[in-house]
């Protein structure tokens, strides 16, 4: 069986595309980058095109599934492997490797990742078992063992990444074997910027072979590598802060062992699926429509009106339930109502089709935690659920880029260099400053950058010698150069920043309604009162104590043990290197938000929740 040929862009071209966009961004911030030189006649289109992080999944199961059971077994899998080796998927290959102190991957890269080495040899008899503890119990660290019947299992997962094929494995947890689970590498930047040999995120299909198989009730595991989060606690803290207010994925820590070798501690995050829906809305028994909005710095899935062509929505919103025409029509209707309804009519029009209160909590969490992967910055990396009554619910998905202060990074040997770990500095990509004029509706949108283009350095900072920008989370001035900074980034991020960005209709349109804006600001202050060291500190201390030995011994980690200890310390200092700690973030951010007064003095008192 032959597959349709795919052209595979070499790794050096992907790196070159990144640097090409960085070079462009320095000089022409308001225009899209010029076309990348296409020496390959198949068309190397940069990281956002074929072969990049947002490339569509390559469907090959149907080509080799001779017994039509929906997966590849035995000789079917062997045949698919042989074909992929001859005709590789464009997303195959390890993460990017840094050059001389340069690229995003490997020692010497911008994050100064520690050198990797083989982990300790561990067997199931060496670890504690927790058979009665819930799957996401934060007081224990389970060990998850995988046995993969190939010596170079990383190369095997790389080969099948970007396809609909899972690599079969035997999983052992709490002394119980689970045969025939499926593995694949997951993530975009957490995969493409991490080299082979370092920790990469995994998705585990527990029911890959046996549809009835469950691990403590779960059919899927998401094991994350904590890319971009040296504290390792962002997902757990976001989940804990969000849980009293909206449906949010649970998270805890696990140790992963592959073919007898420890790969260190991972963050296990609950899957958004029918089981998640049934747990939070038991009356619907898991029914309804579900969408995932994949991560994309282009920020083009903000629930704004994209017209009448359903293809414009299908390219931005990934349906996870059965694709039905009526669900797409309802999603398009929601976008139409959000975008085109006058502010004075919007709440009444949305009431039957949107969980408004949940959406306001979602938006408040996004800003209070300074989520640099959030809706306010990128209009992506979130989930949508439409219940059987036709009401849409907006839910968090990616929680690992929150709770970051700006200013100098931890630095020091093995740590991030100073200037790292900045909070958002200027509006999100495509956004405008507060004083910038409204965009011309008849003018083509400008300032969009392809997926995986890199941010410009903060004003006054030069590019490093190797062409990579200083580390930071959306560092630098507004892309269009206009507008005041509205309180800067990090702990002084204005909760009303960017409300003139029509591409993020859920935010800009909801918060244009005075009564809804007032309710949103009340939620912001509620979260600020809850986000304190007295409330969250004991939990941080518990988790720090629990995983510190694992982090110290982890030979595949993406950041240093010293950074982990610094960021999770109980030190009350809010200056110098200690300013990067979670405690300092809570102190400074909560103080700013509790003292915050909106510039618009006409904000009406909040109405009672409907």
In which residue ranges do the predicted regions lie?
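Extended interaction regions within the primary functional domain
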Residues: 54-57, 65, 76-77
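N-terminal secretory signal peptides that target proteins for export/translocation
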Residues: 1-6
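Phosphate/dinucleotide-binding and metal-coordinating scaffold of catalytic cores
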Residues: 26-60, 82-610
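Acidic carboxylate motifs that coordinate Ca2+ or other divalent cations, activating on Asp/Glu
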Residues: 65-69, 373
């Amino acid at each position: 069986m032959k597959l349709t040929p795919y052209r595979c862009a070499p790794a050096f071209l992907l790196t070159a595309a990144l640097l090409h966009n960085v070079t462009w961004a320095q000089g022409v911030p308001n225009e899209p980058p010029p076309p990348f030189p296409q020496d390959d006649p198949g068309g190397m289109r940069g990281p956002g095109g074929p072969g990049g992080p947002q490339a569509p999944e390559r469907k090959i199961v149907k080509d080799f599934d001779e017994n039509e059971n929906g997966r590849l077994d035995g000789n079917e899998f062997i045949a698919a492997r042989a074909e992929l080796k001859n005709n590789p998927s464009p997303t195959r290959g390890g993460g990017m490797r840094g050059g001389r102190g340069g690229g995003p991957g490997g020692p010497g890269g911008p994050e100064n990742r520690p050198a990797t080495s083989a982990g300790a040899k561990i067997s199931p008899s060496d670890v504690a078992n927790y058979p009665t503890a819930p799957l996401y119990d934060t007081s224990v660290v389970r060990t998850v063992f995988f046995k993969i019947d190939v010596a170079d299992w990383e190369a095997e997962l790389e080969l099948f990444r970007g396809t609909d094929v899972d690599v079969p494995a035997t999983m052992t947890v709490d002394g119980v074997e689970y045969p025939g689970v499926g593995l694949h590498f997951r993530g975009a930047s957490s995969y493409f910027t991490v080299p082979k040999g370092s920790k990469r995120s995994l998705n585990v299909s527990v029911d890959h072979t046996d549809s009835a198989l469950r691990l403590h009730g779960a059919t899927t595991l998401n094991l994350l590598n904590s890319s971009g989060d040296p504290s390792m606690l962002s997902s757990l803290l976001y989940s804990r802060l969000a849980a009293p207010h909206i449906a949010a994925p649970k998270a805890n820590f696990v140790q992963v062992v592959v073919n007898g070798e420890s790969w260190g501690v991972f963050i296990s995050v609950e899957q958004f699926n029918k089981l998640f829906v049934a747990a939070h809305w038991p009356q619907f028994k898991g029914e309804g429509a579900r969408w995932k909005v994949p991560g994309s710095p282009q920020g083009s899935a903000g629930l704004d009106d994209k017209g009448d062509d359903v293809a414009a929505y299908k390219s931005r919103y990934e349906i996870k339930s059965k694709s039905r025409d009526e669900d797409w029509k309802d999603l398009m209707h929601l976008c139409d109502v959000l975008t085109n309804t006058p502010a004075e009519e919007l709440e009444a029009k949305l009431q039957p089709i949107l969980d408004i209160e949940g959406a306001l909590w979602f938006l408040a969490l996004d800003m209070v935690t300074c989520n640099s992967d959030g809706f306010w910055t990128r209009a992506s990396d979130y989930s949508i659920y439409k219940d059987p009554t036709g009401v849409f619910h907006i839910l968090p998905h990616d929680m690992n880029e929150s709770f970051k202060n700006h200013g100098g990074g931890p630095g020091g040997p093995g740590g991030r260099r100073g200037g790292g770990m900045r909070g958002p500095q200027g509006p999100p990509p495509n956004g405008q400053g507060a004083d910038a004029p409204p965009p011309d509706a008849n003018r083509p949108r400008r300032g969009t950058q392809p997926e995986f283009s890199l941010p410009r350095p903060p004003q006054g900072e030069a590019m490093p010698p190797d062409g990579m920008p200083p580390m930071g989370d959306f560092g630098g001035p507004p892309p269009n150069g206009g507008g005041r900074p509205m309180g800067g980034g990090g702990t002084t991020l204005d909760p009303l920043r960017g409300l003139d960005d029509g591409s993020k209709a859920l935010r800009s349109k909801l918060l244009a309604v005075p009564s809804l804006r007032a309710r949103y600001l009340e939620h912001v202050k509620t979260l600020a009162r809850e986000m304190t060291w007295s409330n969250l500190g004991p939990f941080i201390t518990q988790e720090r104590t629990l995983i510190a030995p694992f982090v110290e011994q982890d030979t595949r980690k993406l950041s240093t043990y010293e950074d982990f200890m610094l960021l999770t310390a109980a030190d009350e200092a809010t200056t110098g290197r200690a300013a990067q700690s979670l405690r300092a973030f809570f102190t400074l951010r909560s103080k700013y938000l509790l003292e915050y007064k909106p510039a618009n003095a006409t904000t009406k008192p909040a109405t009672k929740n409907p």
